Amino acid sequence: MAMESALTSTRVSIPSLCSGISSSHHHHRSLSFLNFPKLSSFKYSFRTISPVPFVVSASSVSPSSPSTSVAQSQDLKIKSVPTKPIEGQKTGTSGLRKKVKVFMQDNYLANWIQALFNSLPLEDYKNGLLVLGGDGRYFNREAAQIIIKIAAGNGVGKILVGKDGILSTQAVSAVIRKREANGGFIMSASHNPGGPEYDWGIKFNYSSGQPAPESITDKIYGNTLSISEIKIADIPDVDLSQLGVTKYGNFSVEVVDPVADYLELMENVFDFSLIRSLVSRPDFRFVFDAMHAVTGAYAKPIFVDKLGASLESIANGVPLEDFGHGHPDPNLTYAEDLVNILYGENGPDFGAASDGDGDRNMILGRSFFVTPSDSVAIIAAQCQYAIHYFQSGPKGLARSMPTSGSLDRVAQKLNLPFFEVPTGWKFFGNLMDAGKLSICGEESFGTGSDHIREKDGIWAVLAWLSILAYRNKDKKSGEKLVSVADVVKDHWATYGRNFFSRYDYEECESEGANNMIEYLRDLISKSKAGDKYGSYSLDFADDFAYTDPVDGSVASKQGVRFVFSDGSRIIFRLSGTGSAGATVRIYIEQFEPDVSKHDMDAQIALKPLIDLALSVSKLKDFTGREKPTVIT
């Protein structure tokens, strides 16, 4: 298939209007296929950060505050460090994300960690077990020591931390659930760039493995405004490069293999022998791009050692503090090198990538891109046959509101409960905990199931490999294999195609972006069914609100929607997952049941709606932007 007809996304350069991120940081690096050390010797190098914002060791507590001993338990001396509130620590369910230099300010991270403990009931951590890990980005090493010492100072019994501080977001969730931990810290800014000039983040997950709810994140923020002391254990830095247990009085730190628990879970979810039957075939080739991010630590043990892929199939497989000067966001812009390989002459049969902390994924076939909206729908439609974990069928399906309606049609055909929720994985987690939901996804390259309480990039890759393996299990050597494109087109023929695109305008000036959303809210307040927008007739327009069927909580102002009589949709949202500015996202969708039109390029099929979206929103007037940063 020609690239023009198969590729439902367009790659565009970051405009010079984007501020705060230098163009040199976002150059498209060549894929590097590297030899891997054994996991037991796996380690990556750190640069030294100076100055350290909150030096805590046996000989010093803080460069900025005097301290006093307030408690001593056996060999564990607890110190109280006076502090003052620091502005700008508003916390969401994705935690707190800022530039590294912000977190390096005196007591900035320490204040937030202490505010978290001040927000939790004592029984949620006292003498309990907490998990700690991250994506390997710059500042994680120093942050891990701060977190360990403050946890000890607040009475935590044990910290379980991944070797070298490495644990993917989904592995943290899996470890929390398997070890019945009280919760866990994740050191990551997800898909945002890493390095001294870029982003860092921290979030807390609860005992279900789910991100802390707003009731807790709001308390954390409130406590950052009134904090006056930090409780910290006077212990030396813990060596995170060696597996094993270190004890300080009644507090201990266990350094664990970051892969073991997660790999065990994946082997319980999927039929690895089925996947191996495909991956080890000489006529099947695939590439997994770890983008020099956390899944590099998982790729070889899973894809090579367990499933029989060649070592050369893993690209950018060594986690680096700055992600190899790349932007670890698996889309058609930032994973362009992988895209070029799949669209190149004699490209591999299957390609995939994951992001900084491993929770996002991108799926590609030879000269074919699978939209995240289609991906989750296809996994849901095929899971009962191809994935061992779902052999009794899924309990229910759900998607975020901006995600296309592909999944809705699967739920309808399979007669399954279906939920449309705001953007944010926590909304899925509530439904999972209530036993109402098995498979869910977001158009922002997030896919997952109730095996954990986070989206899971490697899970999605294994799900697709399972589907391909199942569809090809009876194919003899030399027979043409069922391809990714075949699977997707078969799905479209059965369910229809939802043409879908997302325009991202990154790091816009916040005032203009907010003014645009307010303008749209005013516009929809005056709208009514039957209003004409060019050739489109309005069904309804609203600002999406959601009442959680589990706990009754209400989330309002979740995105401005224009839904037309033919089912087409235009949605406008501001995203808050960056560390600076605002990202304006526009979502455009149109359903097409006619198989003869399914091979159209999405940008061509959607052009009338795209033009309407830009016109209605007056985006250029409000933001000054001529072109989007990324088109998906």
UniProtKB/Swiss-Prot annotation:
<keyword id="KW-0150">Chloroplast</keyword>
<feature type="binding site" description="via phosphate group">
    <location>
        <position position="190"/>
    </location>
    <ligand>
        <name>Mg(2+)</name>
    </ligand>
</feature>
<feature type="binding site">
    <location>
        <position position="455"/>
    </location>
    <ligand>
        <name>alpha-D-glucose 1,6-bisphosphate</name>
    </ligand>
</feature>
<keyword id="KW-0413">Isomerase</keyword>
<dbReference type="GO" id="GO:0009507">
    <property type="term" value="C:chloroplast"/>
</dbReference>
<dbReference type="GO" id="GO:0004614">
    <property type="term" value="F:phosphoglucomutase activity"/>
</dbReference>
<dbReference type="InterPro" id="IPR005841">
    <property type="entry name" value="Alpha-D-phosphohexomutase_SF"/>
</dbReference>
<feature type="binding site">
    <location>
        <position position="442"/>
    </location>
    <ligand>
        <name>alpha-D-glucose 1,6-bisphosphate</name>
    </ligand>
</feature>
<dbReference type="GO" id="GO:0000287">
    <property type="term" value="F:magnesium ion binding"/>
</dbReference>
<feature type="transit peptide" description="Chloroplast">
    <location>
        <begin position="1"/>
        <end position="72"/>
    </location>
</feature>
<keyword id="KW-0597">Phosphoprotein</keyword>
<dbReference type="InterPro" id="IPR045244">
    <property type="entry name" value="PGM"/>
</dbReference>
<feature type="binding site">
    <location>
        <position position="423"/>
    </location>
    <ligand>
        <name>alpha-D-glucose 1,6-bisphosphate</name>
    </ligand>
</feature>
<dbReference type="GO" id="GO:0006006">
    <property type="term" value="P:glucose metabolic process"/>
</dbReference>
<feature type="binding site">
    <location>
        <position position="190"/>
    </location>
    <ligand>
        <name>alpha-D-glucose 1,6-bisphosphate</name>
    </ligand>
</feature>
<keyword id="KW-0934">Plastid</keyword>
<feature type="binding site">
    <location>
        <position position="444"/>
    </location>
    <ligand>
        <name>alpha-D-glucose 1,6-bisphosphate</name>
    </ligand>
</feature>
<feature type="binding site">
    <location>
        <position position="359"/>
    </location>
    <ligand>
        <name>Mg(2+)</name>
    </ligand>
</feature>
<comment type="subunit">
    <text>Monomer.</text>
</comment>
<protein>
    <recommendedName>
        <fullName>Phosphoglucomutase, chloroplastic</fullName>
        <ecNumber>5.4.2.2</ecNumber>
    </recommendedName>
</protein>
<dbReference type="InterPro" id="IPR005844">
    <property type="entry name" value="A-D-PHexomutase_a/b/a-I"/>
</dbReference>
<feature type="binding site">
    <location>
        <position position="355"/>
    </location>
    <ligand>
        <name>Mg(2+)</name>
    </ligand>
</feature>
<keyword id="KW-0313">Glucose metabolism</keyword>
<dbReference type="InterPro" id="IPR016055">
    <property type="entry name" value="A-D-PHexomutase_a/b/a-I/II/III"/>
</dbReference>
<dbReference type="Pfam" id="PF24947">
    <property type="entry name" value="PGM1_C_vert_fung"/>
</dbReference>
<dbReference type="InterPro" id="IPR005845">
    <property type="entry name" value="A-D-PHexomutase_a/b/a-II"/>
</dbReference>
<keyword id="KW-0119">Carbohydrate metabolism</keyword>
<feature type="active site" description="Phosphoserine intermediate">
    <location>
        <position position="190"/>
    </location>
</feature>
<keyword id="KW-0460">Magnesium</keyword>
<feature type="modified residue" description="Phosphoserine">
    <location>
        <position position="190"/>
    </location>
</feature>
<dbReference type="Pfam" id="PF02878">
    <property type="entry name" value="PGM_PMM_I"/>
</dbReference>
<dbReference type="GO" id="GO:0005975">
    <property type="term" value="P:carbohydrate metabolic process"/>
</dbReference>
<dbReference type="Pfam" id="PF02880">
    <property type="entry name" value="PGM_PMM_III"/>
</dbReference>
<dbReference type="InterPro" id="IPR036900">
    <property type="entry name" value="A-D-PHexomutase_C_sf"/>
</dbReference>
<feature type="binding site">
    <location>
        <position position="360"/>
    </location>
    <ligand>
        <name>alpha-D-glucose 1,6-bisphosphate</name>
    </ligand>
</feature>
<dbReference type="GO" id="GO:0005829">
    <property type="term" value="C:cytosol"/>
</dbReference>
<keyword id="KW-0479">Metal-binding</keyword>
<keyword id="KW-0809">Transit peptide</keyword>
<dbReference type="InterPro" id="IPR005846">
    <property type="entry name" value="A-D-PHexomutase_a/b/a-III"/>
</dbReference>
<feature type="binding site">
    <location>
        <position position="97"/>
    </location>
    <ligand>
        <name>alpha-D-glucose 1,6-bisphosphate</name>
    </ligand>
</feature>
<feature type="binding site">
    <location>
        <position position="357"/>
    </location>
    <ligand>
        <name>Mg(2+)</name>
    </ligand>
</feature>
<dbReference type="InterPro" id="IPR016066">
    <property type="entry name" value="A-D-PHexomutase_CS"/>
</dbReference>
